[in-house]
Design a protein with these regions (language model features):
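Basic- and aromatic-enriched surface patches that contact anionic nucleotides/nucleic acids
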Residues: 4-7, 15-27, 46-258
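C-terminal active-site-capping segments
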Residues: 33
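Alpha-helix boundary recognition
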Residues: 37-38, 66
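A short, surface-exposed helix-loop junction/capping segment
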Residues: 38-46
Length: 259
């Protein structure tokens, strides 16, 4: 089967299993959420997908927080005590993180950022200050219907006025913490990932695997996926957004292991 043809194969179906899970709602304000990201309590499933929002969409989300408008709830999966992985809401949480840092990732560098986040748990200041990777995060809005500029246009986190900054910092965000009680594995997260939509797009099984299983072997697979010889063999210079190229590598190693 040609590599291009493989990309067209339907993702596998999985059977439904019953789980005993606990779901606990928590309302964290925006700055608490940012602190949890900074400290690594909330980990970014960086193998899941790149940050895909543009500045206009990110600006609308930040505006919603400042105005106190309701936003979709965040779903977190409890891996262990004080350690959570994002099930649904990565784009929103990264937007908060980037806005507080006042830096917005350039579109051509987002695969690199995913790898940096996975290695460090956050993005070092030396990377944030690199203008080839980031630009200033200034809110971007069109003029209002009466022709006046939008009051938040070109605002950065530190240039918000006192009322705007306070509204943003203290805005509560509903976070649903999910913990699997039985069976004693992480199996339920597959079902949760597949049933929750992020931006209207379902996660592929390989994206789910990448979020769950982090090891030196997986790091090696993702590093190999970036190698020029492999990219030439695949016939695509850019890594696949749904990580189907990674899945080809993973299945190839599985075949070698099975003999």
């Amino acid at each position: 089967m040609a590599m291009a043809d493989y990309y067209e194969v339907q993702d596998e179906e999985t059977s439904v299993v019953s789980y005993d899970i606990s779901v606990i709602p928590n309302d964290f304000n925006v700055m608490t959420i940012n602190s949890l990201i900074e400290s690594g309590v909330i980990s970014m499933p960086t193998f899941q997908r790149n940050y895909v929002w543009d500045r206009k969409r990110a600006s609308r989300f930040i505006e919603s927080l400042i105005l106190g408008l309701p936003i979709p709830q965040i779903f977190l999966y409890q891996i262990e005590r004080n350690k959570y992985s994002i099930v649904d809401g990565q784009q929103r949480l990264l937007t908060i993180y980037f806005f507080v840092k006042q830096r917005f990732p350039r579109s051509g560098k987002r695969t690199l950022l995913r790898k940096i986040f996975d290695e460090n748990g956050n993005i070092p200041d030396s990377v944030l200050s690199d203008n080839e990777i980031f630009q200033d995060f200034k809110l971007q809005f069109a003029k209002q219907e009466n022709g006046d500029p939008h009051p938040l246009n070109n605002k950065k986190y530190h240039t918000l006025d006192v009322a705007q900054k306070s509204a943003f910092d203290l805005m509560p965000v509903r976070c649903m913490s999910i913990r699997q009680n039985k069976p004693e594995d992480n199996g339920s997260i597959y079902e949760i990932f597949s049933r929750l939509n992020t931006g209207g797009l379902n996660l592929s099984p390989q994206e789910i695997r990448g979020c769950l299983y982090r090891s030196d072997f997986y790091k090696m697979i993702y590093a190999l996926n970036s190698e020029p010889d492999w990219r030439n063999l695949v016939g695509k210079a850019e890594e696949d957004d749904k990580f189907r190229d990674v899945e080809v590598l993973l299945r190839s190693y599985a075949l070698l292991y099975d003999g």
